[in-house]
Swiss-Prot record:
Its main location: plastid. The keyword Cell membrane does not apply. It comes from Populus trichocarpa. This is Large ribosomal subunit protein uL22c. Keywords: Chloroplast, Plastid, Ribonucleoprotein, Ribosomal protein, RNA-binding, rRNA-binding. The gene is rpl22. Part of the 50S ribosomal subunit. One of its GO terms (biological process) is translation. Gene3D superfamilies: Ribosomal protein L22/L17. The lineage of its organism: Eukaryota, Viridiplantae, Streptophyta, Embryophyta, Tracheophyta.
Amino acid sequence: MIKKRKKNPYEASASGFYISMSAHKARRIIDQIRGRSYEETLMILELMPYRACYPIFKLVYSAAANASHNMGLNEASLVISKAEVNEGATMKKFKPRARGRSYLIKRQTCHISIVLEDISYEEYEEDFLRRI
């Protein structure tokens, strides 16, 4: 039996599927931003010179937009609580070569999911539990 995970009301997420880049290259960026604040993450992603930064930047921005629009959370108090990269399907193409031959070209894809959490809620909850 598969148990459903309870959704935290102070978490917002965004996922990107079949992004055409290697999962290894995307993980290199995700490891740098995991656990950081939303504003710090945007600055890091804008300044890093890798091609993988742009789709990750769009996902972080989208998750923050989901948090502010759908849940009414403040963007200044958001932290990346969970960020993961999984391998997607591999697209296979044939490149024509000399004498009627062909070489196989594999195009890697990956799935990226980012979860932002409101840290002001955690501070409020800790204070509440101390009072009890």
